[in-house]
Every structure is written in structure tokens, then in C-alpha cells.
């Protein structure tokens, strides 16, 4: 019998249908609900136009200006404060780091933007953007390190920096191991 009472209470305590709600609230929410319905329709059309066989596709490229600014700030921080990179190549002054970081981000964004394809959802482009930033950051700190240490002329340092060797990505050489 208790089960029946609970069922009845549940049925009775259900919220009233929308048509029975206050007309004041209904009048206030009506324009909003029409606007929301319009937005839902627009989003549905957009989602349908971007659907792939596996489901809905979200575009992540191009990044927002806020995202680009966050990347820039992180680059400045990495170049101007102590990090794994600075232990090997040294840090830059804040002004220099800002200039270099802006250049790195703009160049990487340009390269990635030129690689945009209409079929891509942006993941490959974002990956390229990230790799370009990493590559250019490493090139710039190597060039500055080589130029400041005097391991050759500035021209030699720039040539070395423009070529990313396979040793950088692979295991450390015997010479690097002995330095560590």
C-alpha cells in the first residue's frame, strides 16, 4: 500500500504544464523563448552543415584573440623566466622576450593559416601552429645562445637555428650527456 501512496504522491507533485503557468511569467519569457528557438534552429542548421559520418564536427581554428594572447604570454614567460629551456640556452630580457614572442606567434599563425583546408576541423592546423611555435622558439633561443657565447658569427648562429636537427628530437649525444 505504501508503494501505491508514493506513486500517487509522485504523480500529484509533478510540475504543472507550461500552459497552466502564470501569464506574467509566460509573457516575459515568450520573446526569449522565441529567440532561443531561433538560435537553436540556427545552431541545428550549422551543426547539420558541418556533420561528418561520425557525428558533429567542431571547428577549433582559427583560435580566438584571447587564446592567441594567452599563447603569447606563455611564450614571453618561457623566454624570460627560468625554465628547462633557459637552463640550457639562457633567458631573455623581458622586452626582448616580448618582441621575440610576438614574432614567433605571428609567424606560426601565418604558416598555420596558410595550411587551412575547408575539409579540416582545425585539429591538424592547431597541431601545425603548436609545432611551428615550438620550432621557432627553439631556433630563436639557439641563435641568441650561439651568438652570445661566440661559437661563431651571428650569421652562422642564424644558419644553425634555421635547421632543426634530428639530434634535438632524439636522444642526447655523448657530448651532451657529459655536459649534464
From Swiss-Prot:
<dbReference type="Pfam" id="PF13943">
    <property type="entry name" value="WPP"/>
</dbReference>
<feature type="compositionally biased region" description="Basic and acidic residues">
    <location>
        <begin position="37"/>
        <end position="53"/>
    </location>
</feature>
<comment type="subunit">
    <text>Binds to FPP proteins. Interacts with WAP, WIP1, WIP2 and WIP3 through its WPP domain. Interacts with WIT1 and HSP70-1.</text>
</comment>
<feature type="region of interest" description="Disordered">
    <location>
        <begin position="1"/>
        <end position="61"/>
    </location>
</feature>
<feature type="compositionally biased region" description="Low complexity">
    <location>
        <begin position="1"/>
        <end position="26"/>
    </location>
</feature>
<dbReference type="GO" id="GO:0005640">
    <property type="term" value="C:nuclear outer membrane"/>
</dbReference>
<keyword id="KW-0597">Phosphoprotein</keyword>
<keyword id="KW-0539">Nucleus</keyword>
<dbReference type="InterPro" id="IPR025265">
    <property type="entry name" value="WPP_dom"/>
</dbReference>
<dbReference type="GO" id="GO:0005794">
    <property type="term" value="C:Golgi apparatus"/>
</dbReference>
<dbReference type="GO" id="GO:0000278">
    <property type="term" value="P:mitotic cell cycle"/>
</dbReference>
<dbReference type="GO" id="GO:0048527">
    <property type="term" value="P:lateral root development"/>
</dbReference>
<keyword id="KW-0963">Cytoplasm</keyword>
<dbReference type="GO" id="GO:0005634">
    <property type="term" value="C:nucleus"/>
</dbReference>
<keyword id="KW-0333">Golgi apparatus</keyword>
<dbReference type="InterPro" id="IPR038214">
    <property type="entry name" value="WPP_sf"/>
</dbReference>
<feature type="modified residue" description="Phosphoserine">
    <location>
        <position position="173"/>
    </location>
</feature>
<feature type="compositionally biased region" description="Polar residues">
    <location>
        <begin position="27"/>
        <end position="36"/>
    </location>
</feature>
<feature type="region of interest" description="WPP">
    <location>
        <begin position="44"/>
        <end position="147"/>
    </location>
</feature>
<feature type="region of interest" description="Disordered">
    <location>
        <begin position="140"/>
        <end position="180"/>
    </location>
</feature>
<comment type="function">
    <text>Regulates the mitotic activity in roots. Plays a role with HSP70-1 in facilitating WIT1 nuclear envelope targeting.</text>
</comment>
<protein>
    <recommendedName>
        <fullName>WPP domain-containing protein 2</fullName>
    </recommendedName>
</protein>
<dbReference type="InterPro" id="IPR044692">
    <property type="entry name" value="WPP1/2/3"/>
</dbReference>
Amino acid at each position: 500500500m505504501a508503494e501505491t501512496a508514493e506513486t500517487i504522491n509522485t504523480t500529484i507533485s509533478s510540475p504543472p504544464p507550461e500552459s497552466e503557468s502564470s501569464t506574467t511569467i509566460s509573457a516575459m519569457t515568450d520573446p526569449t523563448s522565441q529567440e532561443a528557438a531561433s538560435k537553436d534552429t540556427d545552431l541545428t542548421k550549422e551543426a547539420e552543415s558541418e556533420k561528418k559520418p561520425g557525428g558533429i564536427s567542431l571547428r577549433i581554428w582559427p583560435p580566438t584573440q584571447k587564446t592567441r594572447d594567452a599563447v603569447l604570454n606563455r611564450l614571453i614567460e618561457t623566454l624570460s623566466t627560468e625554465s628547462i629551456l633557459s637552463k640550457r640556452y639562457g633567458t631573455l630580457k623581458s622586452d626582448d622576450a616580448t618582441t621575440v614572442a610576438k614574432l614567433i606567434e605571428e609567424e606560426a599563425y601565418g604558416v598555420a593559416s596558410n595550411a587551412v583546408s575547408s575539409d579540416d576541423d582545425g585539429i591538424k592546423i592547431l597541431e601545425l601552429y603548436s609545432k611551428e611555435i615550438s620550432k621557432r622558439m627553439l631556433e630563436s633561443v639557439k641563435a641568441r645562445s650561439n651568438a652570445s657565447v661566440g661559437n661563431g658569427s651571428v650569421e652562422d648562429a642564424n644558419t644553425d637555428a634555421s635547421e632543426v636537427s634530428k639530434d634535438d628530437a632524439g636522444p642526447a649525444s655523448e657530448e651532451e650527456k657529459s655536459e649534464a
